[in-house]
């Protein structure tokens, strides 16, 4: 719904929005400029990458996570419904390659002050939080922030890391 001071103003507003949605032009440094379709493409575009964020249906996540780990990246895996057998295998790959796998089903991380997933803007400080529960980690981080204590890292590992089967 567009509300404007007249039909001409409304039409102009709609035209601007439509142009923005269909434009192939990008400005250097914008999010639209960097949208790799694969792990390999992302690394070709920027070989300094260290973390891959994976958010696909759980059925497809293991393939992408494994590609990222085998490419030397740490992984933030937002995807849920990843079969537990795949999660165990991926955790083993991460350990053997000395990479960090956050998730699957990891909703929150703050790495060197950069939020991934659902995260709050926090003052920087000396505290690091590692938790299975992203909601719990955010609550602790926000309480620390409100108390004037900054947080440098918040790492969610995913809820199944605490189970005997995965942990």
PLM features: what roles do these ranges have?
Residues 1-167:
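Catalytic-core regions of core metabolic enzymes
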């Amino acid at each position: 719904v567009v509300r404007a001071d007249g039909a001409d103003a409304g039409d102009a507003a709609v035209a601007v929005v439509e142009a923005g949605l269909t434009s192939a032009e990008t400005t250097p440094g914008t999010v639209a400029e960097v949208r790799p379709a694969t792990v390999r493409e992302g690394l070709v575009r920027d070989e300094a990458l260290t973390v891959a964020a994976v958010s696909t249906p759980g059925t497809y996540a293991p393939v992408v996570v494994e590609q990222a780990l085998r490419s030397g990246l740490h992984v933030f895996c937002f995807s849920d419904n990843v079969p537990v057998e795949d999660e165990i295998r991926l955790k083993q790959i991460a350990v053997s390659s000395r990479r960090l796998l956050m998730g699957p089903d990891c909703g929150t991380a703050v790495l060197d002050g950069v939020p991934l997933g659902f995260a709050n803007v926090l003052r920087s400080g000396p505290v690091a939080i590692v938790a299975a529960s992203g909601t719990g980690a955010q609550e602790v981080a926000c309480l620390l922030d409100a108390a004037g204590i900054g947080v440098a890292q918040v790492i969610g590992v995913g809820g199944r890391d605490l189970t005997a089967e995965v942990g």
